[in-house]
């Protein structure tokens, strides 16, 4: 089932605050950032890092996606990165990209229920289940999207492209500490990522070396300064690196 961006119908009687409120100044809802990428690239670890870095100043909620389990949500709860009530899980029962792009009903309902149950939030992170390089989010569900790949797949990954690599708002190349172990050339990855994305930003990171994901956190703060429906109350003073096309960790 494919849903367009004009009409979304809930089945539980609650009013949808989705696409009609999408984009900057969406009335009555928090900005939403999607985090996608292949299995094992570090999506959940990045979500955890963002929660740790931002939760002292922002009210954050998280919705995870897995095909048959709640594994990623369970991990985040055990890690204590947020109040457990602010972490919700969608079991898609299908290919991950279907639930974030083709039929976003389950995710949209979960995000809306999260906000209705916990009160006003400043940011909702929606983590996709692990998928391939073609996975992208519908902008009826999110306002910005981060795509995470890692060096363990080899330095050819940015060159292979795909909508996630070329079209995401931020490309994160993760696990740079593993590059010497797998023979990945970070300079090649930087060159190919820049060629594929043009001016769209790319961040290299290692959550082992930098558990706060400082460059990604700065980029998120910069997006919130743009997207905030609450009058631009976010401090983007630490986001100076976010405008740079390439940051190496």
Swiss-Prot record:
GO terms, molecular function: GTP binding; GTPase activity; nickel cation binding
InterPro entries per the record?
A: CobW/HypB/UreG_nucleotide-bd, P-loop_NTPase, UreG
Protein residues bound to GTP: 37-44
Determine if Chaperone is one of this entry's keywords: yes
User: Does the keyword Nucleotide-binding feature in the UniProt annotation?
Assistant: yes
What Gene Ontology terms for biological process does this UniProt record contain? urea catabolic process
Cellular localisation: Cytoplasm
List the NCBIfam families: ureG (TIGR00101)
| Role summary | Facilitates the functional incorporation of the urease nickel metallocenter. This process requires GTP hydrolysis, probably effectuated by UreG.
Q: What is this protein called?
A: Urease accessory protein UreG
Which source organism does the UniProt entry give? Frankia casuarinae (strain DSM 45818 / CECT 9043 / HFP020203 / CcI3)
Q: What is the lineage of its organism?
A: Bacteria, Bacillati, Actinomycetota, Actinomycetes, Frankiales
As recorded in Swiss-Prot or TrEMBL, the protein's gene is named ureG
């Amino acid at each position: 089932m494919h849903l367009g961006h004009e009409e979304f119908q809930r089945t539980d009687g609650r009013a949808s605050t989705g696409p009609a409120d999408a984009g900057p100044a969406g009335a009555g809802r928090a900005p939403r950032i999607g985090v996608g990428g292949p299995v094992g690239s570090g999506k959940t670890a990045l979500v955890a890092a963002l929660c740790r870095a931002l939760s002292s100043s922002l009210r954050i909620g998280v919705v995870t996606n897995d095909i048959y389990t709640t594994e990623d949500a369970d991990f985040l709860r055990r890690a204590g990165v947020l109040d457990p009530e602010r972490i919700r899980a969608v079991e898609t029962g299908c290919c991950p990209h279907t639930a974030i792009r083709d039929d976003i009903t389950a995710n949209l309902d979960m995000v809306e229920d999260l906000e209705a149950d916990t009160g006003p939030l400043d940011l909702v992170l929606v983590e996709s289940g692990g998928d391939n390089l073609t996975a992208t989010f519908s902008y009826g569900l999110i306002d910005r999207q981060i795509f995470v790949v890692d060096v363990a797949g080899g330095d050819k990954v940015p060159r292979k492209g795909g909508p996630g690599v070329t079209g995401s708002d931020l490309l994160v190349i993760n696990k740079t500490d593993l590059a010497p172990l797998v023979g990945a050339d970070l300079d090649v990855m930087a060159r190919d990522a820049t060629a594929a994305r043009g001016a769209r930003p790319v961040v290299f990171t290692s959550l082992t070396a930098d558990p706060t994901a400082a460059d990604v956190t700065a980029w998120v703060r910069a997006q919130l300064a743009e997207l905030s429906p609450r009058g631009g109350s976010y401090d983007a003073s630490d986001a100076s690196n976010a405008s740079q096309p390439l940051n190496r960790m």
